A protein has these predicted regions:
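Short aromatic/hydrophobic "clamp" motif used to bind/position activated sugar donors
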Residues: 87
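Glycine-rich, basic loop-to-helix element that forms the pyrophosphate-binding segment
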Residues: 66-82, 103
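Acidic donor-binding loop at a coil-to-helix junction in glycosyltransferase catalytic cores
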Residues: 231-238
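Conserved donor NDP-sugar-binding/catalytic core segment of glycosyltransferases
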Residues: 99-181
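Conserved short acidic donor-positioning loop in nucleotide-sugar-dependent glycosyltransferases
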Residues: 15, 27, 42-43, 69
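Short, acidic, metal-binding catalytic loop of nucleotide-sugar glycosyltransferases
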Residues: 25-34
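A conserved acidic beta->alpha catalytic loop
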Residues: 26, 41-50, 91-94
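Active-site donor/metal-binding and catalytic loop motifs
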Residues: 123, 220-221, 230, 245-270, ...
Length: 347
């Protein structure tokens, strides 16, 4: 019997067979081979099962099929089936760098339990005419690979094949990768507070399950993913928030890199996000979380929110009634703000 793997890579998927094929190919050449892939097919109706089947003899992979129940359910199912003591959360559209597993493992050699946030870049793997991609990014890619110009047409075009990922991963990344918008958005915060995010009150806002690792027992201890958070957004922030409150440190790794494949996005994303934000407000009634959500509505800068959170924590630790009064006022204000948005949403 094969030894139990020490790392489980959690990948939920739903109707993303073409992207998943490239993602799985990137795990064939990992420098660290002591891992398994745990894929939960969340009710796909495309070729997902066939894609996974082609990798069964090439890499250790377990695939669980279930009716479509959403991201949180799918990840919880994967956690229940995982054998590794360390979980790496990734997505079906993330091409892993060759040292991806090894770099995540290295970050967990510290004595204290931690959440490790890997580094994210983007990659153009499949061209679609309606892709939301900056013109400057296209110009940069064409400068590196001029023959792309003839491939960016009015039809869907595969620019990267599984064979290219398997056999020429580094060259493929060099030709087709570009900065990831989310990573660019949070880069200033990481630069200011360092890789350990010392003095930053909202480290959990940076944790997305496209590239995050954490000991499996910690995830189980805090209750895994909240299945009441439905649709898109904030289920990963919610898990990281609970891990943070339970005492887990947060560490950013610049070297545990994966590459987010550009793809089309559905129209209901912000509708889902707002509904999930409202659930978190009602679930926690916590000043730090509500301050962060105010920044997302453009009502406060992150610097201002961080300063207020630090001051509030100091007052609360001293037992000040001002802290309690502020918490009540903040909760009522933010709850009303997001409830108003919900009432204006169609449907």
């Amino acid at each position: 019997m094969a030894a139990r793997p020490s790392i489980s890579v959690i990948i939920p998927t739903f109707n993303r067979a073409r992207y998943l094929d490239l993602t799985l190919a990137s795990y064939l050449g990992q420098s660290d081979r002591d891992f398994e892939l745990v894929i939960v097919d969340d009710g796909s109706t495309d070729d997902t099962a066939d894609v996974v089947a082609t990798y069964r003899d090439q890499v250790r992979v377990a695939c669980v099929h279930q009716a479509n129940r959403g991201r949180s359910h799918a990840r919880n199912t994967a956690i229940e089936h995982a054998q590794g003591d360390l979980l790496i959360f990734s997505d079906d559209d993330r091409i892993a760098s060759r040292s991806f597993i090894a770099e995540h493992r290295a970050e967990h050699r510290a004595d204290t339990p931690r959440v490790v946030l890997g580094w994210q870049e983007a990659i153009l793997s499949i061209w679609m005419p309606d892709l939301m991609i900056a013109a400057g990014t296209i110009v940069e890619l064409l400068a590196r690979r001029p023959n792309l110009r003839g491939q960016l047409r009015d039809s869907v075009t595969a620019l990267i094949t599984p064979e290219m990922v398997r056999d020429e991963l580094d060259a493929t990344i060099a030709d087709f990768s570009c900065p990831e918008p989310w990573q660019q958005k949070i880069a200033e915060t990481i630069e200011r507070y360092g890789l350990d995010l010392n003095g930053y009150c909202f480290p959990w806002r940076l944790g997305v399950t496209g590239n995050l690792s954490v000991p499996r027992q910690l995830v189980r201890d805090v209750g895994m993913f909240d299945v009441e958070l439905r649709g898109w957004g904030l289920e990963d922030l919610d898990l990281h928030y609970r891990l943070h409150r339970a005492g887990a440190a947060t560490r950013v790794s610049r070297t545990a890199i994966n590459y987010h494949q550009f793809h089309e996005r559905g129209p209901a994303l912000m509708h889902d996000w707002n509904n999930n934000a409202l659930r978190l407000i009602e679930k926690y009634a916590a000043v730090d979380l509500e301050l962060y959500l105010r920044t997302m509505r453009g009502k406060l800068s992150l610097d201002e929110a961080n300063r207020i959170a630090l001051e509030h924590a100091t007052l609360a630790a001293a037992g000040s009634s001002v802290a309690a009064d502020y918490a009540r006022l903040m909760h009522d204000h933010v709850h009303a703000m997001f409830l108003l948005v919900k009432t204006k949403q169609p449907g």
